[in-house]
Amino acid sequence: MLKHDTIAAIATPPGEGSIAVVRLSGPQAIVIADRIFSGSVASFASHTIHLGQVIFEETLIDQALLLLMRSPRSFTGEDVVEFQCHGGFFACSQILDALIALGARPALPGEFSQRAFLNGKIDLVQAEAIQNLIVAENIDAFRIAQTHFQGNFSKKIQEIHTLIIEALAFLEVLADFPEEEQPDLLVPQEKIQNALHIVEDFISSFDEGQRLAQGTSLILAGKPNVGKSSLLNALLQKNRAIVTHIPGTTRDILEEQWLLQGKRIRLLDTAGQRTTDNDIEKEGIERALSAMEEADGILWVIDATQPLEDLPKILFTKPSFLLWNKADLTPPPFLDTSLPQFAISAKTGEGLTQVKQALIQWMQKQEAGKTSKVFLVSSRHHMILQEVARCLKEAQQNLYLQPPEIIALELREALHSIGMLSGKEVTESILGEIFSKFCIGK
């Protein structure tokens, strides 16, 4: 990537829409825009919007709004011009072609964000958060990405960096004055411990952050032929699972994504629980039991028209809901239990609204206050912080056993890893790998 050239790209998704945005950034952005816009772009003040015509080679392309943001007060830190034209394919494509013909280069994926990073407008954590905002598949993932983009994670990383620097400075003073027989190491010990506490807090949040980003897992379980697959289809409002009256039809775990009021749920349909001599069905039942243990919650489906068998003990070890299916045929004999129970019909939809409301309330209660804290969701961040924790633990354990110079080496290694996180120590190849995942125009 050449930092001194000017790049251009369409910043909105392709297809029909009310408007499309073409973005231009670089030292020649204003000069190039001035050559195709009817107004005098060079004379426009920064952060102003102007209505005019886009004309190239004496041909009118479109009437558009032009937004000008002069360096350094722009997202990339460079001169930025955006054309807001009519949506669809042709207007924005012709504007982009004109900009390229006049000297702009087609932007690479994520290149606008990469320039923002290289110009110090955002750090690498914030740059990665931009991509996570775009690809978020539920409201929790979006909010977590938002906390990262707002700099909350970066502030904690800076706090860790400062604590390590302060501990390192103290140790370097001791190394310069070795005549001190019994140096007081309480100060670096406290700094290292505080830094390690923050790092370990983030590491421990990784699994929960992943769960929030990926969605809550709910498993549909129960005896064979109670209507689990019919219920899956009813909740998804589409025929996803095969429904028959033959017990044991479902053998593999069937997973579907279900978006419920912005909450992403991984809905799993499993084999019915029964004793069988069929080896393939046995394997499906074993997988279902394993999935029940790993799931966040269980929807245990019961046939209200059949005699009730004992409930499995696992229902009382994690959030579980009893769904009495076929309630359109007979009133269900509710149990005297603490588990929430619902009379439903996968066939008519009876009771499904109440089930959805209960699931939403349960998830909101489970996640109350969680998305306001900073979670670790990136595997890259997780791996780096594990290395930081290792270095800090080594320094902590050897603080009274090794010379200050040896402890300082561990702390410098921790600082290097912190730099990999923020982007201060990152290599060109890693940057390329990160930003290549972005869409063009971002």
From Swiss-Prot:
Binding site for K(+): 225, 244, 246, 249
Cofactor note: Binds 1 potassium ion per subunit.
Origin superkingdom: Bacteria
Cofactor: K(+)
GO CC annotation terms, alphabetical: cytosol
EC id: 3.6.-.-
Pfam families in the cross-refs: MMR_HSR1, MnmE_helical, TrmE_N
Alphabetically ordered keywords of this record: Cytoplasm, GTP-binding, Hydrolase, Magnesium, Metal-binding, Nucleotide-binding, Potassium, tRNA processing
InterPro entries membership: G_TrmE (IPR031168), GTP-bd (IPR006073), GTP-bd_TrmE_N (IPR018948), GTPase_MnmE (IPR004520), MnmE_dom2 (IPR027368), MnmE_helical (IPR025867), P-loop_NTPase (IPR027417), Small_GTP-bd (IPR005225)
Location of the TrmE-type G domain: 215-364
Span of the signal peptide: none
Chain residues that bind (6S)-5-formyl-5,6,7,8-tetrahydrofolate: 23, 82, 121, 442
Chief place of localization: cytoplasm
GO MF term set: GTP binding; GTPase activity; metal ion binding
HAMAP family linked: GTPase_MnmE
Family label: Belongs to the TRAFAC class TrmE-Era-EngA-EngB-Septin-like GTPase superfamily. TrmE GTPase family.
Protein name, per record: tRNA modification GTPase MnmE
Origin species: Chlamydia pneumoniae
Gene that this polypeptide is encoded by: mnmE
